[in-house]
Amino acid sequence: MNTLHCQPTGFISWNYEISGDNCPNASLVFSTFREQAVIQCPDSFDVRKDSLLRGQWSLVQNDRILASAEKPNPFTRRCTITSDRVNFEIAGANPLLRAFEILMNDRPIGAIAPAHPFTRRATIECDPVIPVVLQIFAFTLAVFAWRRAARD
């Protein structure tokens, strides 16, 4: 299992510095008003929301889509992530907790979890079959859900 440590850049910030196995230093910077972000790992990747009304995002590098994510049901915390290399899902581990499971073929292969209930610090633990940038993309989708919950 690879472990990535996600540390907010400030006390009330949703932006992150990410470090850990196979990831020397990465950063995740969120758009203030939209569900979009930029991943630096060390190359730059954009996370773009494809539609205002549907839960669809793309991971883009140099105008090339590397992966896409879809939230098929707005009432669940589940996203399907598709790329040329791997296909997997993230799903809320428990309706009362912020943690997400990373699933491949309906089998858990990792988790995205806050350090404790009152922090934005988090860890990503995942099988190395999923590339680091896709692990961070999955984390980005989890943070979008956390931000929506914090606003509501």
Regions found by a protein language model. Give the residues of each.
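Intrinsically disordered, low-complexity proline/glycine-rich segments
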Residues: 1-152
